[in-house]
């Protein structure tokens, strides 16, 4: 019980300047009786608040998961029922299929022949045999006509002479397209043959030209070798020089062409064949500076300058 003479003075926050909380923002006064419960949780630490919030969220998630699990269980029950019905239908249709296959196999197998029915005339109680049907009469007439026609055709075939071979139709024999194609084929074959012959001729010409060039080059190289050997004064009677100069025998085709060249070579070298008969250099002068041996060419007036130039080099 409030014994203050002015109790309302202290119950209002407007008349308590030291009790005013400037950080408090709420529609309910700070010292109101309804606000006492709001300030009561200030003593609870923040960790407990966080834990309680997490626990409440986990409980909610657990409830949701349980609801989903129940829904999945219901779906599984429905699917099991559907699978059972489908299994029953499958068994039913497999049995029906086996039955139909057995019937089809039995239909394919020929049935045993039934015993022939006895004619009605054999029975005494029947006065006479039943008349044949109208269709049977027509079938018999058709068979008779067919036999007559086959006989007539056979007799006509025997009496007629063999037919001559059919001539080719003028449309086919005189067809311009076929003649044009045959002419084109002939022209193509002839042109291909001519081209092949031309290639062979060109190849042979190339071979002959290469052979002649080789022969001429061989002769020119032999001539140059002989000239160089005479300029250096090397004895031509040595086996190396004879092997280089006369390594191959001239072919009969090139003998006639090489005759004038050999004659010119002999005239130019002034009877170079005489140099082959001269003896080699003396053993005493073997270690001395080599000098060209004197030949008939040195006495000739137009080779005097060449001989002096060679001696100057040595």
Curated annotation (Swiss-Prot):
Keyword Ribosomal protein: no
Localization terms from the record: Nucleus; Cytoplasm, Cytoskeleton, Microtubule organizing center, Spindle pole body
Keyword Nucleus: yes
UniProt-annotated stretches for the region Disordered: 154-186, 288-314
Coiled coil segments of this chain: 52-109, 184-215
Family annotation (Pfam families): Spc42p (PF11544)
Principal location: nucleus
Gene Ontology cellular-component terms listed: cytoplasm; nucleus; spindle pole body
Domain of life: Eukaryota
Xref: InterPro entries: Spc42 (IPR021611)
Function (record text): Forms a polymeric layer at the periphery of the spindle pole body (SPB) central plaque which has an essential function during SPB duplication and may facilitate attachment of the SPB to the nuclear membrane.
Recorded family membership: Belongs to the SPC42 family.
Name of the featured protein: Spindle pole body component SPC42
UniProt source species: Eremothecium gossypii (strain ATCC 10895 / CBS 109.51 / FGSC 9923 / NRRL Y-1056)
Gene of this entry: SPC42
């Amino acid at each position: 019980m409030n014994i203050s003479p002015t109790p309302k003075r202290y119950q209002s926050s407007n008349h308590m300047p030291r009790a005013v909380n400037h950080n408090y923002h709420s529609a309910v006064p700070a010292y109101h009786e309804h606000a006492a419960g709001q300030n009561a949780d200030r003593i609870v630490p923040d960790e407990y608040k966080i834990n309680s919030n997490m626990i409440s969220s986990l409980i909610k998630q657990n409830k949701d998961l349980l609801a989903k699990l129940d829904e999945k269980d219901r779906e599984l029950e429905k699917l099991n029922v559907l699978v059972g019905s489908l299994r029953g239908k499958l068994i039913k249709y497999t049995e029906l299929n086996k039955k139909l296959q057995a019937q089809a196999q039995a239909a394919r197998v020929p049935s045993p022949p039934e015993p022939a029915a006895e004619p009605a005339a054999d029975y005494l109680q029947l006065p006479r045999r039943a008349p044949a049907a109208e269709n049977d009469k027509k079938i018999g007439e058709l068979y008779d006509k067919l036999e007559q026609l086959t006989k007539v055709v056979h007799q006509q075939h025997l009496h007629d002479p063999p037919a001559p071979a059919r001539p080719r139709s003028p449309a086919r024999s005189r067809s311009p397209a076929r003649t044009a194609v045959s002419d084109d084929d002939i022209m193509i074959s002839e042109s291909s043959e001519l081209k092949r012959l031309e290639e062979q001729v060109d190849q042979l010409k190339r071979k002959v030209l290469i052979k002649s060039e080789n022969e001429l080059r061989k002769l020119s190289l032999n001539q140059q070798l002989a000239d160089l050997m005479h300029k250096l004064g090397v004895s031509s009677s040595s086996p190396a020089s004879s092997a280089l100069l006369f390594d191959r025998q001239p072919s009969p085709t090139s003998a006639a062409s090489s005759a004038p060249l050999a004659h010119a070579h002999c005239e130019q070298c002034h009877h170079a064949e005489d140099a082959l008969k001269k003896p080699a250099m003396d053993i005493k002068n073997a270690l001395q500076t080599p000098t060209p041996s004197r030949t008939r060419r040195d006495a000739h007036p137009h080779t005097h300058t060449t001989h002096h130039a060679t001696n100057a080099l040595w």
